[in-house]
Amino acid sequence: VNEEVRRFLAEIEGDMGGLPRDLHITRMFSSLVAISNGRVIKVADPKLEYCPLASSLYDFPRGLDAESLRKEIIKAAERKISELGLFTGLRPLHRSTIAIPFGASEMMMYDLKSGRAEAAVVVCDGAGTVIAEDPHLVQGIGARMNGVFYTSPIEAVIRGIEEGGGEVLSPETARIDQVAGVERALGRHGRIDVTVSGFCGEGLREIRELESERGASVTILAVCTTGASEERVREIGEFADLVWSCASGKVRGVLGRRARLQIATKIPVYALTDRGLDFAASYSSKGFREYISEFEGPYIISGRCGAIPGARDCRRIRMGDFETYIARVESLPIRSGDEPRPLL
């Protein structure tokens, strides 16, 4: 956990005279949210004023003060608990449909289906680090899930993952340790995907060292980057294959400029490497590979190709289960007027 999460845990401990046995920390609308026994027990002050994704999913009103935003965050978290069972033993663990068009779990699901990757190392509330080969288990864990920065064991979740063919790194503690998860996965697989928190300090360099030692191929997806420090963003740029920009101005400004591919404009995903392009290609059943072999990049994927300044050679392609467009541009990033505010 990073210092901000550590302080949040200390506040919970002080408020309650100790940490609850059942405790999960996620983040919504830039605020850390603590959940215990199926209810929200603490919400940090929000730093964002607006997020297009949150507004779309939860109908957040605009122009709210901090206290009103906190109440909306609590309502949104409670909906996730009551409607989806997240942070409880009732959460679903298998899903085959797309929840977020360019979500990390959606793209990993297709990557596993294509055979490009053999397994994925992900994080699940109630289980911690999980190694999974089943595409639908990966999507079931990740669909509609924000970042998980701390969690505790939930027996029903761990049992469901194991019965579904997944492996929980530490069933006794639900420890989140993506480096150890990669090491475990590389004992059986040579090609894996792994999600790594951009906000916390999970060891990107250590993952690359393991990859080199084992002669493996590891696709690193840097997610949950809101609030990432400049040093962390540079580290992501050095070691990750793809990065989700979330509400990070540093990711857009530093890594967007060197991206090979930008996916979407409001909350862009940037492919930084050839391996990142291959990963994106596995999400496309039609048109993507042909396009990048025909034209030099950088590229942008957007549903509104005609509105992208300087876009050339627009072509319709299929990504996931929907149609969109790819084009080439002179430079990236392409910014949107409808992005999170303020960028952090």
Regions from the PLM with identified roles:
Residues 2-344:
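Conserved mixed alpha/beta catalytic, RNA-binding, or beta-rich assembly cores of soluble enzyme
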